[in-house]
UniProtKB/Swiss-Prot annotation:
Family annotation (PANTHER family): UBIQUITIN (PTHR10666)
Principal location: nucleus
GO cellular component terms attached to this protein's record: cytoplasm; nucleus
The name this protein goes by in its record: Ubiquitin-like protein NEDD8
Propeptide residues per the UniProt entry: 77-84
Family the UniProt entry places it in: Belongs to the ubiquitin family.
Keyword tags: Developmental protein, Isopeptide bond, Nucleus, Ubl conjugation pathway
A single GO molecular function term of this UniProt record: protein tag activity
Record-linked InterPro entries: Nedd8-like (IPR038738), Ubiquitin-like_dom (IPR000626), Ubiquitin-like_domsf (IPR029071), Ubiquitin_CS (IPR019954), Ubiquitin_dom (IPR019956), Ubiquitin_ubiquitin-like (IPR050158)
Cross-link (Glycyl lysine isopeptide (Gly-Lys) (interchain with K-? in acceptor proteins)): G76
Keyword Membrane: no
The organism of origin for this protein: Drosophila melanogaster (Fruit fly)
Transmembrane segments: none
Its job: Ubiquitin-like protein which plays an important role in cell cycle control, embryogenesis and neurogenesis. Covalent attachment to its substrates requires prior activation by the E1 complex Uba3-Ula1 and linkage to the E2 enzyme UbcE2M. Attachment of Nedd8 to cullins activates their associated E3 ubiquitin ligase activity, and thus promotes polyubiquitination and proteasomal degradation of cyclins and other regulatory proteins.
Amino acid sequence: MLIKVKTLTGKEIEIDIEPTDKVDRIKERVEEKEGIPPQQQRLIFSGKQMNDDKTAADYKVQGGSVLHLVLALRGGDSILTPCV
């Protein structure tokens, strides 16, 4: 089934998946098309963040559904310096 993944810039990526595909597999497909590593991706469907271990069917994703891609960027380490 064909679904769409919408990025924050509004770009829509069309991906062919199976209902039994896990979310981590969907993220791999996004990486193939956009070059974004799965660990930096957060997929949102119906207002909920999708768990990597669940399937598209678990979230009731159907053909024509639109998932929203959010980037999960990790912040740098903070360095504490004593005030003198």
